[in-house]
Amino acid sequence: MIMKYVLAIDIGASSGRHIVGWMENGEIRTKEVYRFPNAITDQNGHLVWDTESLVSHVKKGILEAQMAYPVESMAVDTWGVDYVLMKGDKEVLPVYAYRDSRTEAAIPEVHGIIPFSELYRRTGIQFQPFNSIYQLYADKLAGRLEGVTDFLMMPEYLLYKLCGVKAKEYTNATTMGMVNAETGEIDAEIVSRLGLPQQLFPKLSRPGTVIGQYEGIKIALCATHDTGSAVEGIPMEGDDLYISSGTWSLLGVKTPKPLTDENSQAANYSNEGGVGYIRYQKNIMGMWLINELRRELCHEKNFGEIVKEAEKSTFDMTLDVDGPEFIAPKSMKAVFDAALKVPLTKADYFRCAYLSLAQSYRKAIEELEANTGKTYDKLYIVGGGAKNTFLNRLTREATGKKVIALPIEATAIGNLKIQLEGLENEQI
């Protein structure tokens, strides 16, 4: 049997990686061939992405992969909601990042035209101030849509820079808050009522679709939203809970159909696109909390040291860390201080953060079980946070679930799995 090699380009908010994968003895084997930093930068008071750097690193990593393996296909996944506006083949700069505050004025205007209760019934997507629907309306208010011929979600933009084909992939499109939950396509009435250009919203493509090639390598669509690929990469046995633990914690379960009822809306649950299923999940606070505290309090310490000190602390107060004040504060320490109003050691801040994350998970699971009418026994945790044994223990204690922590590159594995299955079925 001839070995088939595929390349996953998996890019998160703080780093990207190129991972080659192949099937061996019924299991996906992987080898990381390139890793690079990524970061939101401040430009004239706005938070933006350096897309030129991203494209450069993507191409460098592909070259490294080609030098080491006979790669047949590749796919890109990134975070959701962010996009690049295009005028023909030219980018409209800057490319704003989801943490920027530019949507503040757009949100009430959007909800004045389409109440959120109606948006939720149509799309099933939880309210987040950075959802693409609000970003696009902010662009409309700012006049940035004039002359725009297209917009590409971040992974599709990177693929366009490789092969010249403009695509819109289903799982990532659902993060926009504009895909109809029942039809799986862009809701034309939402587009019309908001006065957005209809030509920007063509039919969506599904994971497994080949859209072009680059340097002799087929370019395929995986679940281009990283969480969509991550859920594909979790070896769940059945109806199990999952947390994709990174900058954000994505907690959810697979469902055959969307749940867009009032209880799901009240709990702010999302119905995001999966590979043949719906990801009924909630976007809640994650390692962003820890990373920001570390940057401010003890950037010289590694996470292992921080965890050990947090375990020794006896601090037991918790915070609701899913409040808007935690999204992009100038000082995370100041947010904690304002809420707790007691003196803390550095270790206390981190213990409070870990305890609060575990309680956030507990609350989200209670809501999920009430809304689905099911009780779940197992909780799979993947992503960077899965390596944190202290947080895993706190999560087990808070939720009462059997926690199965898999410190694997679940997103890359899911990306690779979609490609390998496509090659096996001769769809790629």
Predicted regions and their residues:
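Conserved phosphate-binding loops in N-terminal lobes of ATP-dependent enzymes
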Residues: 60-73, 129-141, 146-159
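Short glycine-rich phosphate-binding loop at a beta-alpha junction
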Residues: 70-78, 371-384
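Short, well-ordered amphipathic alpha-helical segments that serve as non-catalytic structural scaffolds
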Residues: 53-66, 183-189, 360-365
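Short beta-strand-loop/turn "lid" adjacent to the catalytic site in phosphate-handling enzymes
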Residues: 63-98, 123-130, 159-180, 205-206
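Active-site core segments that coordinate phosphate-bearing ligands/cofactors
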Residues: 7-8, 111-123, 137-149, 153, ...
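Short beta-strand scaffold segments in enzyme catalytic cores
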Residues: 16-21, 82-86, 177, 229-233, ...
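N-terminal glycine/serine-rich phosphate-binding loop of ATP-dependent small-molecule kinases
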Residues: 1-93, 121, 147, 216-219, ...
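Short alpha-helix plus adjacent loop in nuclease-associated cores
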Residues: 100-113
